Curated annotation (Swiss-Prot):
Gene Ontology CC, one term: plasma membrane
Positions annotated to bind ATP: 374-381
EC code(s) of this entry: 7.6.2.2
Compartments where found: Cell inner membrane
SMART domains, A to Z: AAA
Gene that encodes the chain: mdlB
Keyword field: ATP-binding, Cell inner membrane, Cell membrane, Membrane, Nucleotide-binding, Translocase, Transmembrane, Transmembrane helix, Transport
Stated name of the protein: Multidrug resistance-like ATP-binding protein MdlB
Sequence ranges assigned to domain ABC transporter in this UniProt record: 341-574
Amino acid sequence: MRSFSQLWPTLKRLLAYGSPWRKPLGIAVLMMWVAAAAEVSGPLLISYFIDNMVAKNNLPLKVVAGLAAAYVGLQLFAAGLHYAQSLLFNRAAVGVVQQLRTDVMDAALRQPLSEFDTQPVGQVISRVTNDTEVIRDLYVTVVATVLRSAALVGAMLVAMFSLDWRMALVAIMIFPVVLVVMVIYQRYSTPIVRRVRAYLADINDGFNEIINGMSVIQQFRQQARFGERMGEASRSHYMARMQTLRLDGFLLRPLLSLFSSLILCGLLMLFGFSASGTIEVGVLYAFISYLGRLNEPLIELTTQQAMLQQAVVAGERVFELMDGPRQQYGNDDRPLQSGTIEVDNVSFAYRDDNLVLKNINLSVPSRNFVALVGHTGSGKSTLASLLMGYYPLTEGEIRLDGRPLSSLSHSALRQGVAMVQQDPVVLADTFLANVTLGRDISEERVWQALETVQLAELARSMSDGIYTPLGEQGNNLSVGQKQLLALARVLVETPQILILDEATASIDSGTEQAIQHALAAVREHTTLVVIAHRLSTIVDADTILVLHRGQAVEQGTHQQLLAAQGRYWQMYQLQLAGEELAASVREEESLSA
């Protein structure tokens, strides 16, 4: 079990985010002390009224009215100050959360892709949204309450000792009790709060998975199973929350109220019924009033431990993401010129020693067309990801333009090497925004790219042209049109190396022809690396690399590999047989119709 001293580094780091708002926070703290002094003055006025006016049967109207007006004025003044300081704390809290979310998103955007292979998306979303919102409560509720309670307690102690130091000494006996309760609460609540945050992240992750996979869930009638799974996650979160509520219910308000009542009884017994009669009624009233008010800020201080624990745990989760590894790039800013590729004895494993690529060698001259083929799981997409610099190599070296890939800067690598992925990401934005992706590219260049991939006619047919929104995940486009849009996205800034990861799979023949037309247009000034399932699309490749279980088993041109009658020849014959079978089936269907 970690002590408060172990939690302090995280809390200190969270509080440091408030440094840009030191001035408004300082003004808010000053307002708190002034408001506390105004609140504490109320019982002093009533004590004076009882001992000097009621007890002596001296009640001049002007003085009584003046005391009443002063009492009401002080309370209204305190309320106004509390409102003003609340606004200042909220302003600082919103600013802190905004900066924190910016930093978290920046950290997430700069993480290596390998981190997302094992980290559920819902967990990341929970840290950016839910955890940062809990941290907002640290400023709005915890810090504000602690400072306000401290100011109020301090002002009341000054007033109590000024009235009667003996009674004040009895009253402060509650402080050691409060300290013990806070230590016990912190010891037992921390692990429970961590479980609450973890279960909430699991719920977010589950919802994200269900929403993204809704079509599959409904297709295979899995609604009940996923509903049960989400119900179990919700029950776990509920049980953990109930544990915190039970702990709060026992250790906080009821227990402290009991101790406060016992001390109040002690005051009455020691001084209220004292035969010496040295304690005036007004003073006794003031002490009873202060002790009743003292109980509330002390309870608030201990109650805030629950929110403090949640904020610290949320901060740990946020900082874990922020302090995670960053995608590493080199410092060589020189842009790629020729687009040559050299893969020298490269081996790669996603984790441990389970190699998915073994001793791969490949040399691609400038402006050449190289194809990667192989069955599913052979390592084609992995090799493409390595060429993009997404993962560090386990062994060997990749050189682009004769320079180690690891030495290239972020700008040099991303401007020089582009990739069209198998499942293109389409933003819920306009045609134009999906092509430019925030880059400074003219509309004329966008139209040229759309013409190249044969999407210009589609864009013109839409209501607002290239300013037409494409819907969530590009639902207004077909699978083939998404592929063409992804290709246009990389062609607006012609890269030196273009990688197409399974770009000709699962698309219609018309889209395939459009892709081939676009590739023919860029081959003169771009090195092409194509991963193809349809071997008919790569018969013109300068080099074909055949992968099998992570190893390069064959390499050559289409004709050379067919003549060798190896694995490539087997794959080609299987595809021909499949195409002939599909053609005969279509012919039979047309005859029967």
